[in-house]
């Protein structure tokens, strides 16, 4: 009766700039009689509704007519829309059914479509687009013998592992577990592997926190202005950034600004610092940063972990401490040479705080990168009852792309091409182009099971917890997971955005959730076949870099096979046990695990194949 899909029938496609004119086209069957047909658009921030009639445009094929409606530019914001069809005495509604339009009797039956309108001046760093990123958990990458770790202020609670291959402590293996055991990875260890990163065509390294902290994850900040003494010194870090940038590799730091550590200059619960911390006195210069329920032992903390007292982000003194353009934490580390930030738990920050982080970071370096830890669609996220405006142009450049991580893994495991296509298109439609080109595409992180573990099991959570510390995959399990990872990484490297390799995934490391996804990098136990796959994949992406910036279009979705176009490159993933024919597209193979057969009319793709071709 009525055909509409915003991917095909909203122009321009995707999120709009606030200076874009735009229009919708709807195709209505000629024998579908109605009195009136309107689009209803709601401004999510103001509550204002806009109603406008669609007008007949022209007769089209197959007994359909085209109706359309045009709009002048909208203000920056988030909008939702649907269509209303008016008959003599009742209405029906055209609503969003997996992006396609579906007629329903009730407005509540299906969701509206989303329309994102962002600031026309919103830009993201060009140096980042088309590149490849690598994530390192600093304590677990490499321990250089050239650095001798200094004694820490809280040395008495820390545990140093002598054996690099030690299994990390956990609540399964140790009572009163507090993540205080260290493998002693350090800055010089990372720098010693620079040629390794160059071989993988890495252009940015995201480091989990490096500042002083008594815990190996270092999310419990003790001192915002100093590298942890186990990891290195500020002087070494400045040289580290400079040396890597000379080889076109930029450093991204983890910004942990939602909470501090209880064992810190600022809170000082255990008196390991010379400061008067908030825990020590209500006259402390830091007291107003924290929210005490019953001083000193009851206070708000992140998810109830008393080692992570939350800060009051609205507090001006704290906000200045982080964001002052001359003396703030953000500025301090950028002066030492970092190229940007990954903001931990971005949902915990009020909008005003995020605004200031962007202002501060871009003030020092207009090309600074700001990535947020957001686990959902960042354009419509609600946190603490507030609709967030991460991607309207004045906060984040990018987010960790967990929705596509899940979509990729589900696709290669379950082979449902339609579900995969839908999940990809949702973000293509909602994300501003500058953000889409910069989104951080991951398959795993320090907060998830490693990707090989995800691919080896239907559900890793089904594995008994007591088996996880020393779990070894069977050869059959590993071979299956590795083969699926090759498909998954090909997709990761060819979708819009920037692929990020979590350290060790490329050499066959696997593991369950924290801390077993954070083992020491196995320098002497690498899967060379898998590593070569990643090297060749990164070479392919790097050699065709311009094709992987902007422009994305699905060409084919059928059963267990998808094909999408990135400018002059066609990427095909066929998980089916039979061949598929991609009509109208042929060319030379650039990368893949199988040969294709090109004809004047299209390309025959063999079963169980991932391949990229240069379109003729």
What are these regions (language model features)?
Residues 554-585:
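Carbohydrate-binding surface patches
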Residues 137-203, 210-335, 357-363:
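Substrate-binding/active-site clefts of carbohydrate-active enzymes
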Residues 1-130:
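Glycan-association/targeting regions that enable binding to alpha-glucans and other polysaccharides
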Residues 241, 245-250, 258-259, 264-275, ...:
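Active-site-proximal helices and loops of the catalytic beta/alpha 8
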Residues 30, 568-569, 599-616:
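C-terminal beta-strand-rich structural cap/linker in extracellular carbohydrate-active enzymes
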Residues 132-134, 205-207, 251-253, 341, ...:
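Hydrophobic faces of well-ordered beta-strands that scaffold small-molecule active sites
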Residues 520-531, 537-544, 580-600, 605-609:
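C-terminal accessory region downstream of the catalytic core in glycan-modifying enzymes
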Residues 139, 384-385, 437-473, 489-526:
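Aromatic/acidic polysaccharide-binding cleft in carbohydrate-active enzymes
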């Amino acid at each position: 009766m009525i055909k509409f899909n915003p991917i095909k029938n909203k122009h321009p496609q995707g999120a709009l700039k606030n200076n874009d004119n735009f229009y919708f086209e709807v195709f209505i069957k000629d024998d579908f009689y109605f009195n009136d047909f309107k689009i209803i658009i709601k401004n999510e921030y103001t509550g204002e509704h806009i109603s406008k009639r669609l007008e007949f445009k022209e007769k089209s094929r197959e007994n359909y007519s085209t109706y359309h409606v045009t709009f002048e530019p909208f203000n920056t914001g988030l909008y939702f829309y649907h269509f209303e069809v008016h008959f003599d005495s009742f209405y029906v509604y055209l609503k969003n059914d997996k992006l396609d339009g579906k007629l329903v009797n009730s407005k509540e039956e299906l969701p509206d479509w989303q329309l994102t309108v962002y600031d026309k001046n919103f830009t993201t760093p060009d140096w980042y687009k088309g590149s490849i990123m690598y994530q390192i958990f600093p304590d677990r990458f490499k321990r250089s013998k050239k650095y001798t770790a200094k004694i820490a202020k809280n040395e008495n609670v820390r545990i140093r592992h002598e054996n690099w291959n030690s299994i990390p402590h956990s609540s399964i293996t140790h009572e009163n577990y507090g993540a205080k055991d260290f493998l002693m990875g350090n800055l010089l260890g990372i720098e010693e592997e620079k040629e390794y990163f160059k071989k993988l065509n890495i252009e940015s390294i995201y480091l989990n926190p490096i500042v002083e902290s008594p815990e190996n994850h270092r999310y419990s900040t003790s001192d915002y202005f100093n590298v942890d003494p186990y990891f290195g010194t500020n002087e070494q870090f400045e040289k580290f950034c400079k040396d890597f940038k000379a080889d076109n590799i930029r450093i991204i730091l983890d910004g942990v600004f939602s909470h501090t550590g209880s064992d810190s200059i600022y809170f000082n619960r255990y008196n390991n610092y010379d400061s008067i911390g908030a825990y020590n006195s209500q006259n402390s210069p830091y007291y107003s940063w924290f929210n005490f329920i019953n001083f000193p032992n009851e206070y708000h903390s992140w998810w109830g972990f008393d080692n992570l007292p939350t800060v009051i982000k609205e507090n001006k003194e704290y906000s200045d401490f982080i964001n002052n353009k001359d003396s703030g934490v953000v500025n301090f580390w950028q002066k030492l040479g970092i190229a940007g930030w990954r903001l931990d738990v971005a949902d915990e920050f009020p909008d005003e705080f995020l605004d200031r982080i962007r202002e501060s970071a871009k003030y020092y370096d207009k090309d600074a990168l700001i990535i947020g830890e957001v686990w959902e669609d960042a354009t419509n996220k609600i946190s603490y009852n507030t609709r967030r405006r991460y991607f309207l142009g004045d906060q984040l450049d990018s987010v960790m792309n967990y929705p596509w991580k899940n979509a990729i893994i589900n696709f290669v495991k379950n082979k449902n091409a339609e579900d995969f296509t839908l999940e990809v298109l949702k973000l293509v439609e909602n994300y501003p182009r500058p953000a889409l080109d910069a989104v951080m595409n991951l398959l795993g992180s320090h907060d998830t099971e490693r990707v090989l573990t995800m691919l080896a099991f239907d559900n890793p959570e089904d594995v008994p917890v007591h088996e996880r510390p020393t779990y070894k995959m069977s050869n059959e399990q590993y071979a299956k997971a590795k083969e699926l990872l090759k498909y998954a990484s090909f997709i990761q490297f060819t979708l819009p955005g920037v692929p990020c390799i979590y350290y060790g995934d490329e050499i066959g490391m696997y593991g369950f959730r924290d801390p077993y996804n954070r083992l020491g990098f196995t320098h002497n136990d690498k899967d060379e076949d898998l590593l070569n796959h990643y090297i060749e994949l990164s070479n392919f992406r790097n050699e065709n870099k311009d094709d992987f910036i902007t422009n994305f279009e699905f060409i084919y979705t059928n059963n267990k096979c998808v094909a999408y176009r990135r400018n002059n490159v066609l990427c095909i993933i066929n998980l089916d046990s039979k061949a598929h024919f991609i009509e109208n597209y042929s060319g030379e193979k650039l990368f893949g695990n199988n040969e294709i057969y090109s004809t004047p009319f299209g390309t025959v793709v063999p079963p169980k194949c991932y391949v990229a071709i240069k379109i003729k």
